[in-house]
């Protein structure tokens, strides 16, 4: 089973940030949630919840 989460960035920013700590079991549910929740000038990306992505986006202190 794969799990997913949503990250976002302002269109003028370079790096994505964690949007919410909600985990989804279906990629399309994560994308739908992100689209409904985002402001206009933001981009979203749905990522697989794995060790690499967790370390990159969830551990804000390490960035």
For each predicted feature, which ranges?
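Short aromatic-glycine-(Arg/Gly/Cys) micro-motifs in beta-strand/loop hairpins
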Residues: 1-20
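Intrinsic disorder/low-complexity segments, especially N-terminal tails and targeting/processing regions
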Residues: 8-9, 25, 48
């Amino acid at each position: 089973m794969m799990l997913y989460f949503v990250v976002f960035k302002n269109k003028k920013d370079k790096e994505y940030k964690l949007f919410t700590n909600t985990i989804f079991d279906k990629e399309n549910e994560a994308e739908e949630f992100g689209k409904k929740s985002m402001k206009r000038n933001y981009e979203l990306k749905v990522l697989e919840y794995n060790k690499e992505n967790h370390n990159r986006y969830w551990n804000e202190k390490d960035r």
